[in-house]
Regions:
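Conserved loop->alpha-helix
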Residues: 1-120
Length: 120
């Protein structure tokens, strides 16, 4: 997920300005016209919500590798660019595909998260 500002809504479609940096560090450049995407409105900061804040600013793109089951949950391995390794902290939060996850394991150019059934 990433943070965009909607600049227009018309006939059931939304528009947003997307700069070259956003195209470079996200997968937005791979989208086709009329391809459905998930949109979430910003929430008010003074209300109750589940979870915690995750900013929609993107530092880079990882690639999903191995997915393996562990009971009802799933381990997901993600390959990350070496340039991002220093920002990944074990037991820290990391947003992947718009989901805020806890980094369970860190290895060179790789991290693992566990996703519970509710989130999967």
């Amino acid at each position: 997920g990433c943070c965009l500002t909607v600049t227009a809504i018309e006939d059931g479609e939304m528009r947003a300005d997307i700069g070259p940096e956003t195209v470079r560090v996200t997968t937005l450049g791979l989208l086709r016209r009329d391809q459905p995407v998930n949109l979430e409105r910003a929430i008010r900061g003074d209300g109750r919500f589940g979870g915690h804040f995750v900013q929609g600013h993107v530092d880079g793109i990882g690639n999903i590798g191995e997915i393996r089951e562990d009971g009802d949950a799933r381990w997901v391995g993600v390959r990350i660019p070496a340039s991002l390794e220093r920002y990944v902290v074990g037991k820290g939060s990391i947003p992947i595909a718009g989901i805020s996850l806890t980094v369970a394991r860190v290895a060179p150019s790789r991290l693992e998260v566990m996703i519970i059934p509710f989130t999967w």
